Amino acid sequence: MLLVNEKDLVVPGQVLAENEYFPGRGTFKEDNRICSSFVGLVSVRNKKINVIPLQSKYIPKRGDVVIGEITDIRFSMWGLDINSPYTGLLPASEVFGKDKRELESVFDIVDVLLLRVVDVDEVKKVKLGLKGRGLGKFRDGILVYITPTKVPRLIGKRGSMINMVKEKTHCDIVVGQNGVVWIKGEPDMERIAEKVVLMIDREAHTSGLTDRVRELLDRLTGVEPEIQVEESEGTEKPETPESEDFEEASDYSEDVEVSPESEDIEEVSDESEDLEVESEDVEEGTDTPAAEEDDGEAGDAEVKDENNSER
């Protein structure tokens, strides 16, 4: 018997279900009862109960796409902070070069990279790689850190939430599965985007978040609420600003657990020789032309009317 509802906020030791249900992430079984291990939100999938913690550290998984900052240059590899208890390692073989001097000429300390987790061994040694579309070095921008389990809420269903933030601030935004968010735009818009991202992180477990985010964005960017009015003669429509660097959003899972596939993170650019990330322009889709109406039936009707009149 299920004793809680989907997305209920629970505390450690709280009984979630009995008998026919199975324990999942963030839970433990005691006798025939399934209990929560964390303060978090309930997620039920096929009789399996999970608790998604409100606060957690990023645990690397093979295939994850993450944002990391170089903190150390070692012999034949770079060490990176990936917002995790475990340090990420980028071998020189994943880029090029053999000695420390060559490594520094490619990436230096405090450089920020978009990488893929290649492997995680039994002692949590995290090997990173740059082979893949869109992976490489970021130029400028700011970093914002959020709880990794709240990444799907920031992204939203089919990228709806993150797209709204990008459209209203005209910023390029890339979200790593490790809870690191890269933002680049005009300085004032970067600060607005940062404030909104942190708000989503704080209030991810609450209802009505999308409407509150939209209202905050409109207020901070100075956009008035849309009001339906009749246009008078001589009134010019304001031009809609277009962002040349607007990036195409990928589809994201609504579930809290992020799939490790590359489609679960926004692409930044095609892989270039200097491994630097650049924004891509989004090609506007053309509208599908409407099908032409068949005039055959109308023609037949006219012939019948003429025959009737002759009679």
From Swiss-Prot:
Biased composition (Basic and acidic residues): 301-311
Main localisation: cytoplasm
Gene Ontology molecular-function annotations: poly(A) binding
Annotated ranges, domain S1 motif: 63-131
Superkingdom classification of source: Archaea
UniProt subcellular location: Cytoplasm
Pfam family, one: KH_6
Residues covered by the KH domain: 139-197
Positions of the UniProt region annotated as Disordered: 222-311
GO CC terms: cytoplasm; exosome (RNase complex)
Entry keyword set: Cytoplasm, Exosome, RNA-binding
Matches recorded under PANTHER family: EXOSOME COMPLEX COMPONENT RRP4, PNAS-3 RELATED
Biological role: Non-catalytic component of the exosome, which is a complex involved in RNA degradation. Increases the RNA binding and the efficiency of RNA degradation. Confers strong poly(A) specificity to the exosome.
Oligomeric form and interacting partners: Component of the archaeal exosome complex. Forms a trimer of Rrp4 and/or Csl4 subunits. The trimer associates with a hexameric ring-like arrangement composed of 3 Rrp41-Rrp42 heterodimers.
Protein known as: Exosome complex component Rrp4
Organism: Methanothermobacter thermautotrophicus (strain ATCC 29096 / DSM 1053 / JCM 10044 / NBRC 100330 / Delta H)
